[in-house]
Structures are given as C-alpha cells and as structure tokens.
Amino acid sequence: MRGRFLVLEGIDGCGKTTQLKALADWLPASGLMPSGAQLITTREPGGTALGQALRQLLLHPPEEQAPATRAELLLYAADRAQHVQTRLEPALAAGDWVLSDRYCGSTAAYQGYGRGLDLDLITQLEQLATAGLQPDLCLWLELSPELAAQRRSGQQQDRIEAEGLAFLARVHQGFAELSQRPLWRRVDASLPPEQVHQQVQHLVREGLELAL
C-alpha cells in the first residue's frame, strides 16, 4: 500500500518547526498509519545531500553570489526534483509516510506572489520537478505577517526572511489564495502551540480517514 504525503506550509515565524515535531511524535500512535509503515520527516529546501548544498546557496550565499530572481526559482525547482526522485517517491512507494516542511505551495507563495514571477511558469516547473507528485494533505499554518515578524524579532535571519514586512504580506496573500485549493486546510497558528497541535490533529485525522 502506497504511503501518505503530508505537508506543512506557512510564512516564516508561523511555527512550522514546532508543529512538524509535534505531528511527527503523534502520528505513529494515532492509529492512522498502517503497521510497519515508517514516518519520514523532511524539508524543502534541503531534504537531500544535494538539497543541503542548494539550501546554503539559496538562504546563506555570500552577498556577491546571491541568486537573481529567476535563478532562485530554478534552484528551488532543482532541489524539489532531487527530493522527489531520490527521497519522496521511493519512501511513498515502499509504503512509508512522509511529513515535509514546505513543498510546492512555498514556491508559488514566495517566488510567485512574493517575487512577482509568472505563476504559469512556476506551475510548469512544478510539474517537471515533481513528476505529478501531490500531497495527500497540505496544512497552512496561518499567521499574520505582523505577528510572525514579532515572533522572529531578535533572531538571526536568512536571505529570504530578511526581505521585510511588505514581502511577507505578499507571501501571506499567496498562501491565502492557495489554501482555497482542494486538500489544503487552514490552521489558526496565532493560538498557543498546544491548541495549534490540536487543530492539526483534527484536520489530519479528518482528512486522511476520508482517504483511507
């Protein structure tokens, strides 16, 4: 039986890392996963050895080597193509479950809505990079850009996080539009982490039990 593929999306500061860990702790004991299935947690960019190198280029390049906008898009696509072909597809084909911090939604939101690149072009690159692999469920941890910026105040920022509030607002709007798609669910990430996790549990159980 093919495994299930779950994705957490959201702007920087929304609490994805915390919720990914909580979900990874809960899922194996939830009764949703078949006996013998393993749970794999991963991220984009950086879910493979090649992806780690690309992540460094994308998020922490020397100033004079920062990728231009279209180059940035292509580097994210390369990271995803490697991730899908060498890690996601083999795991799912083996019956394992995959939980990913970011996937295609982030590219549409950040490079499409945030950077202003053509969404049709991004969709074409997505189809090439993923070979059609779509998540079974995508959870958008929705948090206002202002609150996200407050949460990250004083923390070291990577190149994307340092883009500023106006950029973050465009990305947030992108996620809001993407969340209207089938298999996307909105989570109120402004609540305390325990309450956010309760929402995540409910939405995962509801979404996957319908598909099982």
Swiss-Prot record:
It catalyses: dTMP + ATP = dTDP + ADP. One of its GO terms (molecular function) is ATP binding. InterPro entries: P-loop_NTPase, Thymidylate_kin-like_dom, Thymidylate_kin_CS, Thymidylate_kinase. It comes from the Bacteria. The keyword Chloroplast does not apply. Signal peptide: none annotated. CDD domains: TMPK (cd01672). Belongs to the thymidylate kinase family. Phosphorylation of dTMP to form dTDP in both de novo and salvage pathways of dTTP synthesis. This is Thymidylate kinase. It comes from Synechococcus sp. (strain RCC307).
